[in-house]
Every structure is written in C-alpha cells, then in structure tokens.
Amino acid sequence: MKTNKTSKFKSLIGPLWIGLCAAFFLTNCRSDIVYSQFSPISYSDGAMSSSDKWHMDSVVRFDYTIEDAQPDYQLLMYVRHTERYPYQNMWLFVEDSLRSDTIEFYLADDRGQWLGNKHHGFIEMPVLLESNYHYPDTGHYSLSIRHGMRDSLLRGITDVGVEIIRNGKE
C-alpha cells in the first residue's frame, strides 16, 4: 500500500502554521502603549459652528497617568486634517507638566503632496515629540497643544492625538 506523503505533510502544516502565527502575535504584538487618545477640534462662536476649524486660543489638553517611571517613553503626537488645510507646514506650542516647546513640522512636501497616512478623506500625520523621554516619577501628567499659526481660525484640522509608548522590553 502506497501512502500519500503530501497529504500527511499538508495535515501537519495547518496546525503548525496556526501555532507559529499565534506564537508570533503573542510575543511580537504585545502592546507597550501606555496612553492613546484623540481629541476632536471644533469651533463655535454662537453664530457659526465647525468641526474642522481650530481657534488659536483653543488648547487641546491630554491628562494621563504614568505608573512606571523606570523605562523611557516615546511621545507621539498626531494631527488629522483634510485637504482644506491651506499650508505646507504647521507650528504648535506644546506644553507638558515638565516643560514647553515650539514645534514646526511639515504636512505636505515641496510639490504639495500630503505626507502621512491617508484614509477616508483624512490625512493623519504622526510627529515624534520625544524618543527617549524619562518621567521623574510615577503620577499624573498633562500635555497641552495649541496651534501657533498666524491665522486666528485655522481650517482643515479635525483632530489632535497623543500616544505614549513604553520603550524596550520588560
């Protein structure tokens, strides 16, 4: 009687493949994200309301807790915008519990092509604020962001987000 080596091999590959995929996802997709939050931008002056206009006096604030001060962290900011955003770059004033900074970054290249991730009519631009940020202690922290552009009412910005990621392995 002749055995079919191919069918035995195929019957072993299925469970082996599933096991390898599960092991990969359990070890490599462990979340080191400590905080991730988006805040929608909206403007209202009583007569007019808009969900994609950011007033220069409007501050977006994120409050979060650091439970482990040992590792360093990555601080990322995200700006979501539409094609209505009129400029190539953007200036932001960023303040956290420990310091403040003025940041310039580009949303479009020299040819006017949007940078970042495009999906569903929005463009999401990640901006690395810090790659090895060390918190002095555990506790509550805050991060505030407001735009520093010349327009008092900046159109095309829909959301601002912050993500804090623990560096390294435990």
Report residues per predicted region.
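Bacterial signal peptide processing site
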Residues: 30-33
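Exposed low-complexity, polar/acidic, P/S/T/G-rich flexible segments that act as propeptides
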Residues: 93-96, 150-170
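Contiguous beta-strand segments within globular domains
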Residues: 57-79, 88
